[in-house]
From Swiss-Prot:
<keyword id="KW-0067">ATP-binding</keyword>
<dbReference type="GO" id="GO:0005886">
    <property type="term" value="C:plasma membrane"/>
</dbReference>
<keyword id="KW-1278">Translocase</keyword>
<feature type="domain" description="ABC transporter 2">
    <location>
        <begin position="260"/>
        <end position="501"/>
    </location>
</feature>
<comment type="subunit">
    <text>The complex is composed of an ATP-binding protein (RbsA), two transmembrane proteins (RbsC) and a solute-binding protein (RbsB).</text>
</comment>
<dbReference type="InterPro" id="IPR027417">
    <property type="entry name" value="P-loop_NTPase"/>
</dbReference>
<keyword id="KW-0677">Repeat</keyword>
<dbReference type="InterPro" id="IPR003439">
    <property type="entry name" value="ABC_transporter-like_ATP-bd"/>
</dbReference>
<dbReference type="InterPro" id="IPR050107">
    <property type="entry name" value="ABC_carbohydrate_import_ATPase"/>
</dbReference>
<comment type="function">
    <text>Part of the ABC transporter complex RbsABC involved in ribose import. Responsible for energy coupling to the transport system.</text>
</comment>
<dbReference type="GO" id="GO:0005524">
    <property type="term" value="F:ATP binding"/>
</dbReference>
<protein>
    <recommendedName>
        <fullName>Ribose import ATP-binding protein RbsA</fullName>
        <ecNumber>7.5.2.7</ecNumber>
    </recommendedName>
</protein>
<keyword id="KW-0472">Membrane</keyword>
<dbReference type="GO" id="GO:0015611">
    <property type="term" value="F:ABC-type D-ribose transporter activity"/>
</dbReference>
<dbReference type="Pfam" id="PF00005">
    <property type="entry name" value="ABC_tran"/>
</dbReference>
<dbReference type="InterPro" id="IPR003593">
    <property type="entry name" value="AAA+_ATPase"/>
</dbReference>
<dbReference type="InterPro" id="IPR017871">
    <property type="entry name" value="ABC_transporter-like_CS"/>
</dbReference>
Length: 516
């Protein structure tokens, strides 16, 4: 690990507390950021991370505690004061002016002018082009922001921070909406910033990013710091145990049981230009992971199996019965359930209650005398909420008020209420905190113990390796590898995702007759 280049931290928060009315959001906020160090800030939702960051950024003022910048006590009354002291926050969804150029966004409110007050656009463009080049990105100062990806917009925010001479960068879930290549580019930029002695606070739920990028970790729980130490001294299990406050025998509680009969069989699924000749089986009591890079066709295969997207050819069988393609209602009746990738847009009606969302797939069962029984609806929501450890006080509260992890549990409960034989779950833990991840993994393990067949689409390799009995890897619309749990590792999976041979070719799967 790179040693600190300063005798004092670049930024230090000591014993900070903050209350909102009777709610104590932060009781013991301690943090020290050193020059040239990437420091992870971890904790479940509600642990106090957001409050701590807002104190650093000047959005909130602490009730008690001390803030020091380069060893000098400071108190930021506004975000502008924090910015002037060299602090910048990069949010996962940047706030830029789409109809202005990159240069105009970076210099908004502080454009250089000549002696008679005219804006010096050439000087702006030269400086911004230099900043972008120093970050190693292919962007131009005169490009409009409209149409740029979230990843490119984050780069603009970083360049803006550097133009303001920021020496502390706070990155709040910066990779949540990025593809794998975009994440790698962001990591390369962060490493360049380290070389310039910038102190970086990196907030994430993805533990693989913590181990890949950071040198030090602070873990928060219930508004207080519970750990501060070197990343190299930690592993996944120890981080999770510190975050949730209890020992976990394993983060991935996959039950070892022999697989049963084939529950889902697909043969020769093809959608021209999207995927071709997809064939595989998923058995009762088995989790099969579908891995691959973004754009490989994984989610499209899942949507086609469920009947949302069309097929040009191929067969789908559920528990020995052939499924009529292109009809989601028939898929549900046959025993298929799909938890989609984007729970907020595709899995929930955010303005409706938790109870209504949890019962939406089985409302027909809850109708009495032509009206939906709200009592039955609430009972159903409480039943699945208890089983999935849903943290929600009032089932009548809008589901949009829940954390990401609890929203995912509602979507899962909604589909489990249909009594499926096969569960397809797309990115099961995207955007949820580590404690909620452990609970989702526990729920999946319980379903598998009860004999359910699970097809899990995931971009998180630790999740794939920890939960799957077999790993199917897709590359450019085809299955490039079928890897047993005992043979699976990150190198094999990534190699297959990139189209490289992994040692064992995919074996042809025989066609089905009238029964599986």
């Amino acid at each position: 690990m790179q040693q600190p280049t300063s005798a004092v931290p670049r930024l230090e928060l000591r014993r900070a507390s903050k209350s909102f009315g009777r709610v104590r959001a932060l009781s013991d906020g301690d943090l020290a950021l050193w020059p040239g160090e990437v420091h992870a800030l971890l904790g479940e939702n509600g642990a106090g991370k957001s409050t701590l960051v807002k104190i650093l950024a000047g959005v909130h003022q602490p009730d008690t505690g001390e803030l020091l910048v380069d060893g000098v006590a400071r108190r930021f009354a506004t975000p502008a004061e924090a910015r002037d002291a060299g602090l910048a926050v990069i949010y996962q969804e940047p706030t830029l002016f789409f109809d202005l150029s990159i240069a105009e966004n970076i210099f908004m409110g502080r454009q250089p002018v000549d002696r008679i007050g005219r804006i010096q656009y050439d000087a702006m463009r030269r400086e911004v082009d230099g900043l972008l080049a120093s970050l190693g990105v292919d962007l131009r100062a005169d490009q409009l922001v409209r149409g740029l990806s979230i990843a490119d917009q984050q780069v603009i925010e970083i360049a803006k921070a550097l133009s303001l001479n920021a020496n502390v960068l706070i990155m709040d879930e910066p990779t949540a909406a990025l593809s794998l290549p975009e994440v790698e580019r962001l990591f390369a930029i962060v490493r360049k910033l380290r070389e310039r002695d910038v102190a970086i606070l990196f907030i994430t739920h993805r533990l693989d990013e913590v181990f890949a990028l950071t040198q030090r970790v602070t873990i928060m729980r219930d508004g207080a710091k519970v750990f501060d130490g070197l990343t190299a001294d930690l592993n996944t299990e120890s981080i999770v145990a510190k975050m949730v406050g209890r020992d976990l025998e394993t983060f991935y509680p996959k039950a070892e049981r022999p697989p049963g009969e084939v529950r889902l069989a697909v043969r020769g699924l093809t959608r021209i230009g999207v995927f071709k000749d997809i064939s595989f089986d998923v058995r009762a009591g088995e989790i099969v992971a579908l891995a691959g890079l973004v754009g490989a066709g994984r989610s499209e295969v899942a949507r086609a199996i469920f009947g949302i997207d069309p097929l040009d050819s191929g067969e789908i069988w559920i528990a020995g019965e052939r499924l009529t393609a292109g009809r989601p209602a028939a898929a549900v009746r046959a025993g298929l359930a799909l938890v989609p990738e984007d729970r907020r847009q595709q899995g929930l009606a955010l303005e409706l209650s938790i109870a209504r969302n949890a019962s939406m797939t089985v409302l027909g069962r809850l109708v009495k005398h032509g009206l939906i029984s709200t009592r039955s609806e609430t009972q159903l929501a409480r039943q699945w909420g208890t089983r999935l450890h849903l943290k929600a006080g009032d089932p009548d509260a809008p589901v949009g008020t829940l954390s990401g992890g609890n929203q995912q549990k509602v979507v899962l409960g909604k589909w489990l209420a249909t009594g499926p034989k096969v569960l397809i779950i797309d990115e099961p833990t995207r955007g949820i905190d580590v404690g909620a991840k452990a609970e989702v993994y526990g729920a999946l393990a319980e379903l598998v113990r009860d004999g359910m067949a699970v097809l899990m689409i995931s971009s998180e390799l630790p999740e794939v390796l920890g939960m799957a009995d077999r790993v199917l890897v897709m590359h450019e619309g085809r299955i490039s590898a079928d890897i047993a749990r005992a043979d699976a590792d990150e190198e094999r999976i990534m190699g297959a995702a990139l189209g490289q041979p992994v040692g064992h070719p995919v074996q042809p799967i025989p066609p089905l007759g009238h029964a599986v």
